[in-house]
Design a protein with these regions (language model features):
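Residue-identity detector for threonine
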Residues: 33-34, 69, 90
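Short N-terminal "domain-start" leader segments
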Residues: 1-58
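A short, exposed loop/beta-hairpin motif centered on an aromatic-Gly-Thr core
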Residues: 61-78
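Functionally constrained cores in energy, signaling, and assembly domains
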Residues: 46, 79, 91
């Protein structure tokens, strides 16, 4: 089972914090900060999962989804433009 999305969490020693979400296309943006203070933005379309009771919830993408429905953008001059572009992406399903 994959855990449901949370506003803040830690994984691999990095801190993740929800920056924004687009309800219409299930796109999320999280700020990922390494212990050294390097900032990335992870933009992705959430996965739909079912819990043991059959309730649907959203989860973080798998590593294999990066480059397809998820992207990691290092903070910098054009980071926000890229984040906005991906946040508005449309999907056929």
């Amino acid at each position: 089972k994959y855990p449901p999305l949370k506003d803040k969490f830690k994984k691999y020693g990095d801190s993740f914090e929800l920056v924004s979400k687009n309800e219409s296309n299930r796109m999320y943006c999280y700020r990922r900060t390494t212990p050294e203070g390097i900032v990335y933005f992870e933009v992705f379309r959430s996965n739909l999962e079912k819990d043991d009771n059959g309730n649907v919830y959203e989860s973080y993408p798998r590593s294999s989804q990066f480059g397809d429905t998820a992207w990691c953008i290092r903070d910098g001059e054009n980071a926000m433009k890229k984040v906005l572009k991906y946040m508005q992406k449309t999907f056929s399903n």
